[in-house]
């Protein structure tokens, strides 16, 4: 197998691939152009979206030529893949702003040049519908489209005609990228398999060119939960939506059974180093988790920020060091207040989702103020509790928050 493909396989990226042997031989002979697409449905991607772009970075290191397709036009329709209901229709301004943000985010993470980024509005916005149906639609079988899981699952919930067109447009994207950039490979999540296959078929019928598709497994944690979800919601790559400290802690709290898998997927460490540190036992495995958290934080937010939150994490858990990057909640006593009920402060700061959960944690001995266990549900804080205008609140073993006046 080609070196780059073999690397993707070893690191757990490879789920399905069309004509793997032919693609491998082609990549041995020449450096190919390949692409992954992303729609502008949000102002930020989350960690679950990152897999294709990490794979792109690996392929780029082997000399292959990446294209990131920003689907600003296809966002107007919405991809039905993996969805049980129609996506919210966004305004043109929202889509434009999201596309701008996502491009900047991915350019910062991947370090790809601007010429690697293309918007599909370049060709989709000016399509003539009648001509598109005649020249492109004729090559699609409705029966075959309905056989793909993307549409089969949605038929039970309702599938709009606008969404039914999505596969044609994504296929046309691949066709256009092959035409203008000689793109030979599309990569994406395994839920995109049907769309990718349709694009390959369209190019073969329209241009007589063999192209390829490669998909990645949809990443889940060992507890069965989808990768990229936390108690605070999606683990966004934008620090204004999900703090860098919380991002680091999300990976620092990886379960033991996921450490090796995530080191292969979310870092660029060499195989022998991953094998060494992922085989640590007991408390030593925490070192592997710290390495994992640091490496992926460095990729997404840069080394300087990764060092800051690593130091803050060490300070929180080991009791020494720079604590300034531990997340904080700004609080002020009202003029009439002499004290504040801790349970209310816990809810306001969102360190607990409800008062009942806060009471349960206090009763179980899981809440600490400045390292001292809170014994009473009705515990109150006064100004005197705030040394240097702050206190440190710990909930459970892993949640730390500075309350700052």
UniProtKB/Swiss-Prot annotation:
SMART domains: S4. A motif ('KMSKS' region) lies at residues 226-230. GO terms for molecular function: ATP binding; RNA binding; tyrosine-tRNA ligase activity. GO terms for cellular component: cytosol. GO terms for biological process: tyrosyl-tRNA aminoacylation. It catalyses: tRNA(Tyr) + L-tyrosine + ATP = L-tyrosyl-tRNA(Tyr) + AMP + diphosphate + H(+). A motif ('HIGH' region) lies at residues 40-49. Signal peptide: none annotated. Its main location: cytoplasm. Catalyzes the attachment of tyrosine to tRNA(Tyr) in a two-step reaction: tyrosine is first activated by ATP to form Tyr-AMP and then transferred to the acceptor end of tRNA(Tyr). Homodimer. Belongs to the class-I aminoacyl-tRNA synthetase family. TyrS type 1 subfamily. This is Tyrosine--tRNA ligase. It comes from Borreliella afzelii (strain PKo). The lineage of its organism: Bacteria, Pseudomonadati, Spirochaetota, Spirochaetia, Spirochaetales.
């Amino acid at each position: 197998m080609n070196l780059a493909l073999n690397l993707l396989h070893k690191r757990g990226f490879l789920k399905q691939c069309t004509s793997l042997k032919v693609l491998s031989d082609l990549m041995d002979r020449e450096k190919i152009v390949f692409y992954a697409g992303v729609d502008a449905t949000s102002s930020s991607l989350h960690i679950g979206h990152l897999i294709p772009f990490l794979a792109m970075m690996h392929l780029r290191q082997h000399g292959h030529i990446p294209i990131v397709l920003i689907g600003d036009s296809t966002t107007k329709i919405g991809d039905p893949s993996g969805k049980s209901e129609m996506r919210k229709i966004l305004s043109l301004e929202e889509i434009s702003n999201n596309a701008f943000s996502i491009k900047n985010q991915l350019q910062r993470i991947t370090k790809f040049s601007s010429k690697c980024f293309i918007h599909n509005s370049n060709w989709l916005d000016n399509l003539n519908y009648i001509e598109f149906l005649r020249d492109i639609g004729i090559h699609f079988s409705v029966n075959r489209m309905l056989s793909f899981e993307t549409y089969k699952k949605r038929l039970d919930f309702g599938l709009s005609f606008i969404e039914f067109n999505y596969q044609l447009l994504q296929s046309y994207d691949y066709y256009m990228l092959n035409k203008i950039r000689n793109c030979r490979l599309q990569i994406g999540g395994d839920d995109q398999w049907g769309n990718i296959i349709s694009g390959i078929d369209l190019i073969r019928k329209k241009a007589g060119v063999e192209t390829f598709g490669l998909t990645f497994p949809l990443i889940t944690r060992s507890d069965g939960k989808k990768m990229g979800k936390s108690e605070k919601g999606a683990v966004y790559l934008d620090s204004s939506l999900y703090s860098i400290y919380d991002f680091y802690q999300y990976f620092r709290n990886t379960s033991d059974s996921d450490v090796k898998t995530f080191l292969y997927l979310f870092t660029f460490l060499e195989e022998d180093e991953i094998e060494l540190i992922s085989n640590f036992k007991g408390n030593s495995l925490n070192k592997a988790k710290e390495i994992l958290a640091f490496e992926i934080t460095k990729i997404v937010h840069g080394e300087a920020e990764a060092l800051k939150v690593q130091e803050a994490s060490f300070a929180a858990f080991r009791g020494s060091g720079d604590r300034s990057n531990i997340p904080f909640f700004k609080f002020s006593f009202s003029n009439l207040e002499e004290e504040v009920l801790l349970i209310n402060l816990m809810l306001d700061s969102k360190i607990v989702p409800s008062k009942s959960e806060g009471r349960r944690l206090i009763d179980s001995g899981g809440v600490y103020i400045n390292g001292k266990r809170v014994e009473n549900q009705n515990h109150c804080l006064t100004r005197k509790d705030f040394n240097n205008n702050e206190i440190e609140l710990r909930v459970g073993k892993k949640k730390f928050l500075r309350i700052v006046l």
